[in-house]
Every structure is written in structure tokens, then in C-alpha cells.
Amino acid sequence: MSRVSFEVSGGYHSDAEAGNSGPMSGGQLPPIYKKPGNSRFTAENSQRTRTAPYVDLTVDVQDDTVSVHSLKMEGGSSVEESPELTLLKRNRLEKKTTVVKRLASVSHELKRLTSVSGGIGGRKPPRPAKLDRTKSAASQALKGLKFISKTDGGAGWSAVEKRFNQITATTGGLLLRTKFGECIGMTSKDFALELFDALARRRNITGEVIDGDQLKEFWEQINDQSFDSRLKTFFDMVDKDADGRLTEDEVREIISLSASANNLSTIQKRADEYAALIMEELDPDNIGYIMLESLETLLLQAATQSVITSTGERKNLSHMMSQRLKPTFNRNPLKRWYRGLRFFLLDNWQRCWVIVLWFIVMAILFTYKYIQYRRSPVYPVMGDCVCMAKGAAETVKLNMALILLPVCRNTITWLRNKTRLGRVVPFDDNLNFHKVIAVGIIVGVTMHAGAHLACDFPRLLHATPEAYRPLRQFFGDEQPKSYWHFVNSVEGITGLVMVLLMAIAFTLATPWFRRGKLNYLPGPLKKLASFNAFWYTHHLFVIVYILLVAHGYYLYLTRDWHNKTTWMYLVVPVVLYACERLIRAFRSSIKAVTIRKVAVYPGNVLAIHLSRPQNFKYKSGQYMFVNCAAVSPFEWHPFSITSAPQDDYLSVHIRVLGDWTRALKGVFSEVCKPPPAGVSGLLRADMLHGANNPDFPKVLIDGPYGAPAQDYKKYEVVLLVGLGIGATPMISIVKDIVNNIKAKEQAQLNRMENGTSEPQRSKKESFRTRRAYFYWVTREQGSFDWFKNIMNEVAERDANRVIEMHNYCTSVYEEGDARSALIHMLQSLNHAKNGVDIVSGTRVMSHFAKPNWRNVYKRIAMDHPNTKVGVFYCGAPALTKELRHLALDFTHKTSTRFSFHKENF
């Protein structure tokens, strides 16, 4: 027996109270969400002011009959039985009055609700399913949702209307069903027919033609971008006979197709399991089918649950911050320029002073040489050209010395770890400075060679004998007659060979070649677009430095050895760099490692677990170099360490991107086998025979080396962002944070047990982090297998929820899109029941599509005012600009200070 209250007049409202009031009543029903305007039974806001009287109706629902048990007005007074009510008791439900119309709607909804909950009383055996849908129906519907999402509203209707007028010019304004796809601009004729039938069924149109008004109505539904409308269209196309029922096979098909549309292969493989989960939820009595409306209810509930609710105070704060973050435009160009310059200097002062100092030193050297040669005896003949050439040469000598310093990684790591220079020197930009100096070398070499070949040498060749006489001490008694005189000399040969070798090395070091982006190169030349080509051609600089010393010694215009300063510039940097390379070779041979475990994961990722050498101390966020002689005895490649400093092993996760990593995966795949059931990875191999296992290739390591992410401990709040394989340094940091917090808690417990007081917090305390936000964005679902065990471990150990983890799978359509609605609903059901996310396979709930980074920064700024937040990013360069800009924007406009750091290898 069910009781329903509604208003007698006005638009009806329902405060449905479905309770167990008797042995014949149905079970407790779940709340149902419907958007206003839905033709089905609608539960509206019960808080709305009501002026019309209430009617308290108690009805008995059994099978297909509805009988009224009692009917009372508000206050308890009975209502006289009317002819309409008598008809209602007889189950005729003739719609003669407004009240009866409402009662009929209520009874219809109650029948629907009881069918959802499994029926009442003596349940009628289920009717044979009348499902004549083909397996292509759901598939076509999913494709249709893509089309529906791409329509362009009013602008599209004008084109549709124009085609309608052209097509129906000979049919009297009636559009044939077969011409529907052509009229709305749909290329798939079969899908257009399916869509036409679905839209026609919704409106009880049985003919094969429609007029212009009906077409516009069809178009409005197609163009309606609301979640409910697109979902309704999807279901209408699946439910061909409009009986509103789905069997388990059909649920399985929809899950499989939804997973396929979102590139979720794991869910596709487990479609049977998830279909059974939905049937268990919506068909607890094993009738054999579920109502389409019940599935829609779950989908809508899942969609509404994805919306984060906020308190009024938080909403106001969010609104105020949004207003403050709106860009402001100053009409005064000088003020705009000053404001931009001030912000730039505040955020980049470390880089600025280094670059300015570099320019000043080069300017001083250039000016010094220019003045020196302007006073020399060669100036009257060779003019300012020789001054320009010698000034540029001096800057080249300086830069050829400086360019080695940023790649002395051991020295830089020692300086940033053991000294306070990191406060003023941007060690994180070492590779960027290396590239800037390379540009300076290119400019200097161009000026030097150009001034000689195009200016002062021609002037020397065409000088008169009288003018040449003072230059005999430099070029000999016989005046040069051609360029060959200069080319055939030591200076000429060494100079041309250096330029050629540097041109090769610089070209292959550009991102297009180094990262293999030039796919259009012919077969033999494709090997030039690789990291290997960059690595080996960079060693040509060994020859370049030897030639540079020779070129600087055999000078035309300088005879005294102490004035030949090239070797003076180079001696310290070259010796320092040579020592670095010797240390790498020596250290890697001493610190022997054995391979404990190897796994090959989806997405071409190779995970290697190594034994940890004694005295190998590192910080989370640092990286090390790896060498495998079976691939190449000379190549060393940097990879972030994914294990935590407290672990007794070292681990790296290597993404197969180039020729070296591809060969490395091939070598290890030969000793790997498919894992047992329940173990992640496509291939695995564990060390079972100790250090003498001959199956694994020998691996050498060198490191650790400093990286920007290692400074995360300096911040109380950190935002960690990893894009794809860029999550590797962040994984180590996340583990380290948990370990440090656990250690602090254990130390506090020990002090409490011993009765000692808590030590005063030091300003130099190494670990300050109290809150961490980790965002991992990846394109493929299989990527979550890389760190599945680590994510589960962190989620389990982080009892105080210090770390907030967010996984984003960009292959899935964003939350709120009908194409991902079923996936989101499955995610909610499975996580509630099993505590596992169906997308990532971890305890961490995944999100769909890309994060809204502005909202991420905004939420952190609201939660942590007057706090300095460290933002650490590792991944593709495309996102760097956005994250850095947001960090600057929120720093300048809120009380939260965001300090952005990017990993560089």
C-alpha cells in the first residue's frame, strides 16, 4: 500500500512517501531524479510554497490494478466519493476531470516504480521479452551521440531548412524518411534512418514522412546539448520496440560499446562482470530484465553525484576570487609595460641576473678586443672587420668554456645539496642555460667567420704593396693572392672543420631531430632523427675542442704564447668535465647492481627493480643514468627514480620512445614471461637465482643527480603534476611524504610513551610538507598499471589523507557527457561495493577528460591562503606554459604564492 500527497489545483507536486505499510506493499524505493519538463512522473521541490489544499491518497497496487483505499483532505477531513473516484477504484481511470488526470498519472508512476523494485505481493511471472534489437542498435546510438555533440545550433538549422526546401520542392513540403539524413547533413544513411525512427517513436509518428514543423522539432532534440536529452535519444535508439526493458546481454553490449567508445579495453574485457553488477543492483529478484528507466535513474544519479557541492561561504569565497582573477586592462601602455616587467622580474630574477651578467662579460671581452685591434698595425688595411672578428672570437672562447659547466651534473648536484647557492643561482635551468650559450656560440662563430671571409681577407688581398708592407710580420713577405692561401693554412683548416662538426652536432641536437619528430625523412635518414644520433654527434665536440686549441695557437696576428689565451679559457672547464666522466665510469663499475624484477606494462613501459648499492643516498625527485651494454656500451640515459629513499631497492620506469629504449625493451622481453593471474603487467621476470642469474643483461647506474622536484620538502603544500610517464618523479615523492609522515607520527608516539616533550620546530627543518595534491594525467587506461601497487599502498597507508590523489584518463569523455555516463555509473557502483576504481584498478577514483587547471589552482588558493605552494611538473612541454602562467596569475592576485618548477633532463 502506498501513500501519495498532492495538491488539488495548480501544477501538481508530489511528496511521494513509499513505505512498507502492509504485507502487500512494495519495497523501499530509491529516490528518483528527473529534470523539470520530463513527461514522466516528476518529483519537484517540496519546499516550494503551496497555496492549494492537500489530498492524502492511499492506494493498493496489485499487478495491473490500482484501487483507492482512502482519500482525505488536508487536516484529516474525508473527501466525498465522486463518480470519477468510483471509476478509479474500478481501475477504469477515465480522465474526465483535472483531479482524475493527476490520479491517473500517479497510478501509472506507482506501477512503474513497483516494477523497478521487483513488484508487490504475488508477483506476476515476467513476460517474454519482446526485444528485437540488433547488436548494431547500441553501436549506432553511441555513434549518434558523437554526431549530436557536434551540431551547431541555430546556425545549423538555417542550412537544414535550406536543404529541406530544396528536397521537398517536388513533394509538397513533406520530407521522406529516406531523405532525412541528407536533409540534416548526416553522412551515415543507416544511422539517419535509426535516428529518424527513434525520434518518430517518441512522438508517435507512424508514417514515412514528416513536415517542416516536425523536422524542426526533431532538430531541436538533436541539437539539445543537455545530458538528459542526449541520454534520452541514446536510449530511444537502443529500445527499438519502446517496451523499456533491457536484458543482461543488452546491458553487457552497452557496457562493451561504451568502453570501446572511450578506449577502455580493460572494462571491455570485464563487461560480463559489470553487467552482472548492474543486474544485481537493478534486478535483485532475478526477473531477467531491468527497466530502461531504472538504468536511466542510476545514470542520472551518477551524473549528479559528480557535481561537488559547496557551502554558501565557500561559494561566496569562490565567486570573490573569480572576480579578482578576471583580467584587468589598463589603458595606459606605460603602466601596462611597467606592471608586466615588474611581475616578470619578480618571478625570474634568478635567471635575469645570470643572463645579464653573461651579457656584460661578453660585452666587456668584445669591447676589449675591439679596442686592442683598432690600435694594432693591421687596422689601416683590414679596418673594423678585423676588430669585429677578434671581438667575436673572444666571446666564442668564453662560451666554449662556459657551455661545459651546466652539464657537470655531479658538481651541480653537490652545489645545490651542500651550499646555499641554490637560493640565487637557478640550478634547475642548467640545460636551458646550456642551450642559450650554444646560441651565443653560433652567433659568435658566424660573426667571426663572416668578418674574416667577407671583409678583412678581401681587403688584405686587394691592398697595395705599400699598405701591405707593415703586415709582412704577420702574413709573410709575399702578399696573399687568393682565398686558398688562408684555407690551406692551419687556421683555415681547423676553422672550417670546427664549423662543419659544430653544424652537425647543433642540428642533430634540435628537438626535431633529438626527439624523432621528423617522420617524413626517407628511410636511411630516419636514423638521424633519434636520441642516438644526438648522443654520438655530441661527442664530436671532443675533436672540436682539440681543433679549437690548435686554431687558437696558430694565429696570424699573435705571436707571444702568453697572448694566446684559448687554452686559458678552456683548461678548468675541460678538466672538470673530464673528471665528471671519469667519476661516472669509476662509480658505475664499483657500485654494482643486480636486477631483482622486470615488468613490461601496457603503453610500452618497462619497469626495472635493482638492488640498492651501499652508500647510494638519494632524495625523492632525483634521477640517475642507466647503461645497458647489451644495447650500447657507450650510451647513458637519465631516468627518474621511482622508489622512495626508505626502500631497499632502486626502481625506474622507462617509456619506450626512441631506438635505445626500444632495444632495451627487446632485450628484457626475451627473459620475461606472461605473469600469473591477478598480477599486473604484460610480461614479468623476477630474480630467483641470486646475483649470478645469467638471463638478465648487465645494467650499470650512475647517480643520483639533483632535480627540481627534490626541493618539494621546502614547501608545506605541494602540487605534483605528472603527464604520462612524467609521473615517475612524483611517485617517489608521494611515497616519501607518506613515509616521512609515518616516521613523524611514530616519533611522536615514542615521545608520549617516554614522557618527553616535543622538540621545538626548527626553521631549518628538512621536511615541512603537510599537504600534497597529486594529479596524474594519462591518455590510456593501461597506463594506470605502471604504479597500481604504489597507488594502493599510498591510499592504504595515508590514514590522515595528507595526500589527495587524482587520476585523469583523457581517453574517456568528460563527466556529464552521455558517452561516458554509463562508465561513470559503473565506477560509482563498483567503488561503493568493492572499493576499487574500474578505470585505474586502484583505490583512487579516476576522473575523465582533462583537468581544469584553473579550478585546481583556485581550490588550492582557497584552502591554503597566505601559504607558499610548490608546483612541480614533469611531462610534455605543451602544458608547461599554462601551469606556469596560472602559478604567476594566482600568485599576483591572491595571498597564496605558487612557485613553479619543471623537470629538465
From Swiss-Prot:
<dbReference type="InterPro" id="IPR039261">
    <property type="entry name" value="FNR_nucleotide-bd"/>
</dbReference>
<dbReference type="Pfam" id="PF08022">
    <property type="entry name" value="FAD_binding_8"/>
</dbReference>
<dbReference type="InterPro" id="IPR017927">
    <property type="entry name" value="FAD-bd_FR_type"/>
</dbReference>
<dbReference type="InterPro" id="IPR000778">
    <property type="entry name" value="Cyt_b245_heavy_chain"/>
</dbReference>
<feature type="topological domain" description="Extracellular">
    <location>
        <begin position="373"/>
        <end position="436"/>
    </location>
</feature>
<keyword id="KW-0575">Peroxidase</keyword>
<dbReference type="InterPro" id="IPR002048">
    <property type="entry name" value="EF_hand_dom"/>
</dbReference>
<feature type="binding site">
    <location>
        <position position="250"/>
    </location>
    <ligand>
        <name>Ca(2+)</name>
    </ligand>
</feature>
<dbReference type="InterPro" id="IPR011992">
    <property type="entry name" value="EF-hand-dom_pair"/>
</dbReference>
<dbReference type="InterPro" id="IPR013130">
    <property type="entry name" value="Fe3_Rdtase_TM_dom"/>
</dbReference>
<dbReference type="InterPro" id="IPR013112">
    <property type="entry name" value="FAD-bd_8"/>
</dbReference>
<feature type="topological domain" description="Cytoplasmic">
    <location>
        <begin position="1"/>
        <end position="351"/>
    </location>
</feature>
<keyword id="KW-0597">Phosphoprotein</keyword>
<feature type="region of interest" description="EF-hand-like 1">
    <location>
        <begin position="168"/>
        <end position="178"/>
    </location>
</feature>
<dbReference type="Pfam" id="PF08030">
    <property type="entry name" value="NAD_binding_6"/>
</dbReference>
<feature type="transmembrane region" description="Helical; Name=6">
    <location>
        <begin position="714"/>
        <end position="734"/>
    </location>
</feature>
<dbReference type="Pfam" id="PF01794">
    <property type="entry name" value="Ferric_reduct"/>
</dbReference>
<feature type="topological domain" description="Extracellular">
    <location>
        <begin position="584"/>
        <end position="713"/>
    </location>
</feature>
<keyword id="KW-0812">Transmembrane</keyword>
<dbReference type="GO" id="GO:0033198">
    <property type="term" value="P:response to ATP"/>
</dbReference>
<dbReference type="GO" id="GO:0004601">
    <property type="term" value="F:peroxidase activity"/>
</dbReference>
<protein>
    <recommendedName>
        <fullName>Respiratory burst oxidase homolog protein C</fullName>
        <ecNumber>1.11.1.-</ecNumber>
        <ecNumber>1.6.3.-</ecNumber>
    </recommendedName>
</protein>
<keyword id="KW-0106">Calcium</keyword>
<keyword id="KW-0274">FAD</keyword>
<dbReference type="GO" id="GO:0005509">
    <property type="term" value="F:calcium ion binding"/>
</dbReference>
<feature type="binding site">
    <location>
        <position position="241"/>
    </location>
    <ligand>
        <name>Ca(2+)</name>
    </ligand>
</feature>
<keyword id="KW-0521">NADP</keyword>
<feature type="transmembrane region" description="Helical; Name=4">
    <location>
        <begin position="537"/>
        <end position="557"/>
    </location>
</feature>
<keyword id="KW-0472">Membrane</keyword>
<keyword id="KW-0479">Metal-binding</keyword>
<feature type="topological domain" description="Cytoplasmic">
    <location>
        <begin position="458"/>
        <end position="492"/>
    </location>
</feature>
<feature type="transmembrane region" description="Helical; Name=2">
    <location>
        <begin position="437"/>
        <end position="457"/>
    </location>
</feature>
<keyword id="KW-0560">Oxidoreductase</keyword>
<feature type="domain" description="FAD-binding FR-type">
    <location>
        <begin position="587"/>
        <end position="711"/>
    </location>
</feature>
<feature type="binding site">
    <location>
        <position position="243"/>
    </location>
    <ligand>
        <name>Ca(2+)</name>
    </ligand>
</feature>
<feature type="domain" description="EF-hand 1">
    <location>
        <begin position="226"/>
        <end position="261"/>
    </location>
</feature>
<feature type="topological domain" description="Cytoplasmic">
    <location>
        <begin position="558"/>
        <end position="565"/>
    </location>
</feature>
<feature type="region of interest" description="EF-hand-like 2">
    <location>
        <begin position="203"/>
        <end position="214"/>
    </location>
</feature>
<feature type="region of interest" description="Disordered">
    <location>
        <begin position="1"/>
        <end position="49"/>
    </location>
</feature>
<feature type="binding site">
    <location>
        <position position="239"/>
    </location>
    <ligand>
        <name>Ca(2+)</name>
    </ligand>
</feature>
<feature type="compositionally biased region" description="Polar residues">
    <location>
        <begin position="39"/>
        <end position="49"/>
    </location>
</feature>
<dbReference type="InterPro" id="IPR017938">
    <property type="entry name" value="Riboflavin_synthase-like_b-brl"/>
</dbReference>
